Amino acid sequence: MATNNLSILFVASEVEGLIKSGGLADVAKALPEALQNLQQDVRITIPAYTSIERLADAEVVLETNLTSWPHTKYRVLLLTLGNNPVYLIDCDPYFNRPSMYAENNQAYTDNGERFAFFSAACLDMLPKLAFQPDIIHANDWHTGLVPFLLKHRYGNDPFFAHTKSVISIHNAVFKGVFSYDDVQCLPEFHCRNVPDAAVSATHITMLKAGVMNADKINAVSPTYAEELKTELGSHGMAWEFQQRAGDLVGILNGCDYSAWNPETDIYLPMNYSADKQSMVLGKNTCKRALQQRLNLAEKDVAMFGMVCRLTQQKGVHYLLPALADFLKHDVQVVVVGTGDPVLAAQLEEVAAQFSDKFVFVEAYDNELAHLVEAGSDFFLMPSEFEPCGLNQIYSMAYGTLPIVRGVGGLKDSVNDYDVDPCDATGFVFYEPTSQALLLTMLRALLLYAQNLTEVQRVQLHAMQKDFCWRKAAESYLQLYRSALN
């Protein structure tokens, strides 16, 4: 085991650059990359989904068997992503499907077996590949059985004698709850009495298995780590997180500034920097382009943007009742996103009623998302809960002031103007109501109307904040070393 440079296996269900459905994929690419830049040996493992375009280029490095499964044969394929090797666990019956997790909004009925197999194969392959990691870093429920199996199956295996496990909690809402029948391929569950994984007499939760067996646990922001110890924040796992409180830390995710940088962003009509003249000209140009794209009047009014999944978590249900009052003012608002059809229909109604001020774009449009970040003056994130959040960090990089609810990573990353104007980077409210959101939007609008110069000062200050992945990676290294000690 190296004292300074560690060998790390980063296990996830998806990784940006190969396959992505959400923010976990961004972390799975950026964190290993940042750790590699700190001279660590980091290798990523994901399933070999057939929808990965680069799969045909992969090298076969192992063909082997995993006993006691209906489908025992699997291969390990090798690709590189940047400077990181990526091992792909290839087993057609489990991963040769049109999607990763679900089809037609219906989760695959054998997801428990699929990701139990993946977790078991991740550990099974290591001695066969002669890769002996110091740390195995699991992520969310999909890989929750990795720390469990490391302890229960390989606890006395000399190959793993010095290997420790860490699990990251990106969103505790999703726990991976399955019946014992779903995971009967694992002998460890044959007795149907596994307290450190059980959620009832008949079901286990893979996330609990990870939390109760990992050497260290991290949440993706310090505030979220505290929230996980409450019933509301943990969505039913408060006891488990309280039991492991001494091993639970919060590390705020970093930002991939190579993809989100107004100085180099290829989607903007004009790039700009954190220089006042450059920022004012650049943001005004982007606002005009955004207004043209949305068929809104090209005028100097405050622009409020929101890009999100249309779910209750993102606080769209707080925004909707606030819009009728807010849109009486001289403002423009754009919401971009897909998701809940009921929320989408309600947003369409507002757009029909206030067509000169409010636009709803029901789409996932990356180019438009970049333009909204640059062309807006304020960015709305009234989340019900937000483990980390990234859009508030992107917004600050683009000189767009986030309006956030003070939960999770939003609380950790945004400084409220009313609390400390000098160090402000946005506006924060706490009460989970439409009225609290409305009052905060009006606070921002009033400052814009009365003192645009002050708004621009705060925007420039926000642009100078640094949430780079290197800082986060250094914190993860400390966490890994504490696990090893």
From Swiss-Prot:
Gene3D superfamilies: Glycogen Phosphorylase B. One of its GO terms (cellular component) is cytosol. The gene is glgA. Its EC number is 2.4.1.21. InterPro entries: Glyco_trans_1, GS/SS, Starch_synth_cat_dom. This is Glycogen synthase. It catalyses: [(1->4)-alpha-D-glucosyl](n) + ADP-alpha-D-glucose = [(1->4)-alpha-D-glucosyl](n+1) + ADP + H(+). Belongs to the glycosyltransferase 1 family. Bacterial/plant glycogen synthase subfamily. GO terms for biological process: glycogen biosynthetic process. It comes from Vibrio parahaemolyticus serotype O3:K6 (strain RIMD 2210633). CDD domains: GT5_Glycogen_synthase_DULL1-like (cd03791). Pathway: Glycan biosynthesis; glycogen biosynthesis. The keyword Nucleus does not apply. Keywords: Glycogen biosynthesis, Glycosyltransferase, Transferase. ADP-alpha-D-glucose binds at K20. GO terms for molecular function: alpha-1,4-glucan glucosyltransferase (ADP-glucose donor) activity; alpha-1,4-glucan glucosyltransferase (UDP-glucose donor) activity. Coiled coil: none annotated. Synthesizes alpha-1,4-glucan chains using ADP-glucose. The keyword DNA-binding does not apply. It is an enzyme of class 2 (transferase).
